[in-house]
Amino acid sequence: MKRTILYLMLAALALLAGCTQDEELSAKPVIYLYPESDAKPVDYLYPEAEMEVTVSLDYDGELTCVYPAMENGAWSVTASPDGTLTDASGQTYNYLYWEGVSATAYDFSQGFCVPGGDTAAFLEDALSQLGLNRREANEFIVYWLPRMEANPYNLIAFQFDTYTDHARLTITPEPDATLRVFMAWRPLSTPVELPAQELPAFERTGFTVVEWGGAEIS
């Protein structure tokens, strides 16, 4: 009998914790959240003239998908000024793709709480400020919007050093300009208040590398 009562008390506590999760977040936004995966980072290469480029990734986690395949831990492609990438077999690609699982803690001390129905407009504006061109922003939005727009709210924070410190790219020859846009986000049932994040501008010059990706925090 005592054991049964103990189980019932534990179950009740678990239910209360689950019911108050959003209320706690509303009162005080979570600063660090842990993702299940880093979803769809893609890398575009834009040299001024056609050149051979090698890209390697040092990732603090487990890679779950890579396309095209790496050889000896790196991609080796011929990059054209329009962004077309060609491998040794002659196959062409628009970008390099990878996905992985890590225990990185993403920073939500600043960011944005966006109503689900406003997500497309928000992303168009934010990605333009960050420096993605129209094609890159379109591919970003088409990937993420179906997961976000039906939510009542989305908590969004773009990650910079927090992301790049655990997913390090080495590119040879070294680019003149590198932009890495990574969005960590979480669906919410109620809004939260947090300081708005300042989004840095980016200038494309010479050999430019652009990456975008994101992680949904469940």
Describe the residue ranges of each PLM region.
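Positively charged n-region of N-terminal signal peptides that target proteins for export
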Residues: 1-4
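Repetitive helical segments and hydrophobic/amphipathic motifs
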Residues: 11-12
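C-terminal motif of bacterial Sec signal peptides marking the signal peptidase cleavage site
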Residues: 15-18
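Protease-labile, long low-complexity intrinsically disordered regions enriched in Pro/Ser/Thr
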Residues: 21-218
